[in-house]
Amino acid sequence: MKPAYAILLGLFAAFPALGASDVKNGQKLAETHCARCHVIGDFNKFGGIGSTPSFGLLIGMADGFERFRTFFERRPHPAFVSVPGVPRWTDLPPYAKPFEVTPENIDDLISFVRKLD
């Protein structure tokens, strides 16, 4: 794990205690950005990319919520997801529309995903 990501993960771990997350914002983030590759549920149950795990499958994994918390550093996400203060892993242009997430966005997304569980 790159040092900047280790520091960022520590910051993310601290954020849930700071305040309530926004489930509706998490849902909006998932539907806007994640649904282009992942099946989220009834929202796009016939969508996604065939080789990409659905949110339901990810939730069922032993480390599923950790995968959501660290998705921005897991392939292929670093190519198009940016985090403030963390340099991208590559200078190559993103192959999907890039977007930025914050620790609050991650908490919102996880709150939404917990509602799906």
Regions found by a protein language model. Give the residues of each.
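The canonical Cys-X-X-Cys-His
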Residues: 31-41, 109
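C-terminal capping alpha-helices of c-type cytochrome domains
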Residues: 86-117
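Extracytoplasmic/secreted proteins, especially bacterial periplasmic and envelope-associated proteins
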Residues: 25, 29, 54, 63, ...
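Inter-heme linker and motif-flanking segments adjacent to c-type heme-binding CXXCH motifs
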Residues: 41-44, 115-117
